[in-house]
Amino acid sequence: MRYFKKIVGSRCYLSPVNPDDAEKYAEMLADLEVARNLVIAPQIISLPAEREFVERACKTGYIFAIVDLESDTLIGNCGLDNVDLINRSSECGIFIGNKQFWNKGYGTEAMCLLLDYAFSLLNLQNVMLQVYDFNARAVRSYHKCGFKEIGRRRKARIIAGAAHDVIFMDILASEFTHGRIRVPIEPQEDKK
């Protein structure tokens, strides 16, 4: 599979999602260890359903494949949802579905790249996310990116018979310190 390097970091890059990757995503999401951390955990992800999701995501332009910079291996995806360009706000989500890349900083870097896109190119002011209380690894990663906890919905999710809090976190553009995107804008000469 060929990926396009839209936003590049030191370990990974974000590429527009490709409908041909639907099977890889469906396989990743079929792993309960991966899916339990996501809102979709109780759902059964079929290949046709995942293909439909990816095709829909391609049309929004706000969902990216996360790809390892060294090997060009697809490792997950991230994106913005409910983008409100008038109020300059959005929600975001991420998953690293290839477990070989867990605990190596890929999720943190991919989220920072996504936030850089949101704040530098879309000119958003606020980005919010939700995470389960048992997902300590993700909470630490989000704190590293600059997210702050803004509230909890207590015992709002029952997973494997246990009640868990949903933690709400957000970050403002003024709080984001990991920005890298620089788009050189040079004056165009008037051709007469």
Mark where each language-model region is:
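Conserved acetyl-CoA-binding loop-helix of GNAT-fold acetyltransferases
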Residues: 103-117, 139-144
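Conserved active-site tyrosine of GNAT-family acetyltransferases
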Residues: 142, 147, 169
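Conserved GNAT acetyl-CoA-binding A-motif
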Residues: 120-130
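Acetyl-CoA-dependent GNAT
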Residues: 43-100, 172-175, 184-190
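Conserved catalytic-core motifs of GNAT/GCN5-like acyltransferases
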Residues: 128-131, 148-165
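Short coil/loop residues immediately preceding or within conserved phosphate-binding loops
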Residues: 9, 61, 75, 87, ...
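Short glycine/proline-centered loop/turn elements that form peptide/ligand docking sites
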Residues: 107, 111, 134-138, 155-160
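A short, well-structured alpha-helix characteristic of acyl/acetyltransferase catalytic modules
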Residues: 1-52, 175-192
